Curated annotation (Swiss-Prot):
Keyword DNA-binding found: no
Source species, domain of life: Eukaryota
Pfam hit, one: WD40
Name under which the protein is recorded: Nuclear distribution protein PAC1-2
Mitochondrion recorded as keyword: no
CDD domains: WD40
Disulfide bridge partners, by residue number: none
Coiled-coil regions listed in the entry: 63-87
GO aspect biological process, one term: cell division
Cellular compartment(s): Cytoplasm, Cytoskeleton; Cytoplasm, Cytoskeleton, Spindle pole
Free-text note regarding domains: Dimerization mediated by the LisH domain may be required to activate dynein.
Organism encoding this protein: Chaetomium globosum (strain ATCC 6205 / CBS 148.51 / DSM 1962 / NBRC 6347 / NRRL 1970) (Soil fungus)
Record domain LisH: where: 9-41
Length: 453
């Protein structure tokens, strides 16, 4: 057998083993090895032995670290190879096309200041501000372009679980919800002063979203809670105007449709529910069943995705772009993502994550769905290619990823000139909104990451 080590390397290894055995009180074994290797006290005394005591352990741990690094690099190489294989001259030439842009490593910024898990984030619809909420009970406001912390908001007494910017144009507010069972409203125009605190839930409030005004005079907010209910609030009056009951477990997430008529909720009861809040006494219009564990997140498909979702559903033509709540997506602790149609039928199950799915967002261009999970990855699924996973950011975070958001689009100049509507962005036609190539994630590693073109 040809020796792998040189004579000097072998001598170093032998001395390291003897020193390790001696340091761990295995004197009999050490003495036997000394005798077989001719390393008696006259050659390898106590002083020299002490110099080698920790060498074997250091070598061992360095090998483990190198192995992990090699595995990470191999995973990254596979992801890059996959991206390269599926790139064509046409797709490469469209890299600057926002409808085909996907986030890639490294992130533009890694924002660090929170002292505990970061649970949520939200982009300001107009300015380069981003808000994040954490288990440290604070909300932090950042300038995502500069990567700098602007201010820290204190008021909640327990973990901040979700946040959202919204309200009519010119009067945008920030809403936050917490394990302290409250929702707080903050005014960005007045140095983020806490203007109102909404109480009424009997458990942690896990999700909060502004709803497009219906009619224009109203300012609505919806919340989801561990008390198994959803609540709709009039933020001007500060009152709960509707309580929606139907879930039999903790309601983990809720999102409004673009027109504000429908809500999509999901929870630990393994169901997703569609609600029509325009009804005087709303009940769940649809119950989606199919996941094998709790559903952590949900999302409405934008009209831009209808052509791809319709193909997945086997439809000859897509629904009209003016309709809402035609297709939906849910992410679960069963590690899968399910796509649903308006009848509550699962049209596709996306498999690839190795742990709980914690966040979903549809690409504004409509062709892709992005997801994050406790497997520390961000994945991109091509809805126009049978939902195939076409990109994986394996190094998105060092620990579980808790949230994923895509920055809202910017209304093109002149798109709403002369219009009386001063409502939120969702009321603007998709063709009049410029896509921003800007995505952010949060994690158990206490970091907010910005992925931008």
């Amino acid at each position: 057998m040809n020796p792998v080590l040189t004579s000097r390397q072998a001598d170093e290894l032998h001395k390291s083993i003897v020193a390790y055995l001696t340091a761990n009180n295995l004197s009999t074994t050490a003495a036997t090895l000394r005798e077989e290797l001719s390393l008696g006290e006259d050659v390898f005394d106590a002083e020299k032995t002490a110099k080698y005591q920790s060498l074997l352990e250091k070598k061992w741990t360095s090998v483990v670290r190198l192995q992990k690094k090699v595995m990470d690099l191999e995973s990254r190489s596979v992801a890059l190879q996959s991206e390269l294989e599926h790139s064509t001259p046409a797709s490469l030439s469209k890299r600057k096309d926002p409808t085909s842009w996907l986030p890639r490593s490294p992130p533009r910024h890694s924002l660090e200041s929170h002292q505990a898990i970061v649970n949520c984030l939200a982009f300001h619809p107009v300015f380069s501000s981003l808000a994040s909420g954490s288990d440290d009970s604070t909300v932090k406001i950042w300038d995502w372009e500069l990567g700098e912390l602007e201010r820290t908001l204190k008021g909640h007494t327990r973990a901040v679980l979700d946040i959202d910017f919204g309200g009519p144009r010119g009067a945008i507010l920030l809403a936050s919800c917490s394990s302290d069972s409250t929702i707080k409203l903050w005014d960005p125009a007045d140095e983020y002063k806490n203007t109102r605190t909404l109480t009424g839930h009997d458990h942690s409030v896990s999700a909060v979203r502004f709803v497009t005004s219906r009619p224009r005079s109203e300012n609505l907010l919806v919340s989801a809670s561990g008390d198994k209910t959803l609540k709709v609030w009039d933020i001007t009056a500060g009152y709960c105007i509707k309580t929606l009951q139907g879930h039999t477990g903790w309601v983990r997430d809720v999102v409004p449709s673009l027109d504000g008529r429908f809500l999509l909720s999901s929870g630990t009861d393994q169901t997703a529910r569609l609600w029509d809040i325009s009804a005087a006494d709303p009940e769940s219009k649809l119950v989606m069943v199919g996941h094998e564990n709790g559903i952590r997140c949900c999302a409405f498909a934008p009209p831009a995705s209808y052509v791809h979702m319709a193909a997945l559903a086997g439809l000859k033509k897509p629904p009209p772009s003016t309709s809402t709540a035609e297709f939906m997506a849910t992410g679960s602790r069963d590690k899968t993502i399910k796509l649903w149609n308006s009848t509550g039928t699962c049209i596709k199950t996306l498999v690839g994550h190795d742990n709980w799915v914690s966040g979903l967002v549809f690409h504004p261009g409509g062709k892709y769905l992005l997801s994050v999970a406790d497997d520390k990855t961000l994945r991109c699924w091509d809805l126009g290619d049978d939902g195939r996973c076409v990109k994986v950011l394996a190094d998105a975070h060092g620990q579980f990823i808790t949230c994923l958001r895509w920055a809202p689009g910017i209304v093109k100049k002149g798109a709403d000139q002369g219009a009386e509507d001063t409502g939120p962005l969702e009321k603007t036609a998709p063709s009049e909104v410029q896509i921003r190539c800007l995505v952010a994630t949060t994690s158990v590693d206490k970091v907010v990451r910005i992925f931008a073109d």
